[in-house]
């Protein structure tokens, strides 16, 4: 009796990836494997990453996403990079959920349909979750893909998000397990993995990446990618942030990462997670457009669009349009 074969031609990209993941034994990446990628000559690494990218995506297409903070500041965690932590003296003004969430519709309406629209708030209490669910339903009704980043989830909350129509949940690992204690002490690495498990159990797409340039070593950058690539199902979207140093946070004043090391990280992410969107996230404002172009060549195919990401700056919309025109890139 012949095994049944699924015709994947009529499926969208995410559905195809799920079918192929079941039919093909995934490669498990060791940290040493990924370090070896980092150590390739730059042109060889770029060629390999671009080849993998072309096998899985339109090489000239970039997903354009929008991020809206619906609750800002006053967070009880101690993430060393984050100006929203209440314990740090930064210029971030606290804004409660209801005030920040007003005007969601006006922020969404100008956007092109099917663009992912991400709503960010840190750990809303259960009583605050209903307004978030209402925002998800509202954005979903406009035909956009919905994404939320709300921090740790408790039992039952992922199910509520799924029922509201959430497409993606963002929850980053930040860094490798070995370096995590240098970044945050109020939550464990396992806490983050448990939240991702809750999201996966509800069959919500996962957006998960990290922050590069927090003082971690190259081996630790490889360790983060190994964590992501070796998940039972790798994240559908992998945001790679370049540390934005904010005065008042413990990581302000750190040595800046060499830009080519960031490009290498993008290339290694593309090779190890060939079917994931690799997103240039926070930190793009400080990148020369030549470095951004190299990141796209290395396999980055998603950006956040708009002048502000949560509490940090982002390239102006017109600058992004001009860069896309120079590079022959079109929005997906």
Swiss-Prot record:
Q: Which SMART domains match?
A: BATS (SM00876), Elp3 (SM00729)
What is its pathway? Cofactor biosynthesis; biotin biosynthesis; biotin from 7,8-diaminononanoate: step 2/2
Transmembrane segments annotated in the record for this chain:
none
Identify the CDD domains for this entry.
Radical_SAM (cd01335)
Cofactor binding comment, as recorded: Binds 1 [4Fe-4S] cluster. The cluster is coordinated with 3 cysteines and an exchangeable S-adenosyl-L-methionine. Binds 1 [2Fe-2S] cluster. The cluster is coordinated with 3 cysteines and 1 arginine.
Q: Catalytic activity annotated for this protein?
A: (4R,5S)-dethiobiotin + (sulfur carrier)-SH + 2 reduced [2Fe-2S]-[ferredoxin] + 2 S-adenosyl-L-methionine = (sulfur carrier)-H + biotin + 2 5'-deoxyadenosine + 2 L-methionine + 2 oxidized [2Fe-2S]-[ferredoxin]
Give binding positions for [4Fe-4S] cluster. Answer: 75, 79, 82
User: Which keywords does this chain's UniProt record carry?
Assistant: 2Fe-2S, 4Fe-4S, Biotin biosynthesis, Iron, Iron-sulfur, Metal-binding, S-adenosyl-L-methionine, Transferase
- Its EC number(s): 2.8.1.6
Regarding protein family, the annotation reads: Belongs to the radical SAM superfamily. Biotin synthase family.
Write down what this protein is called: Biotin synthase
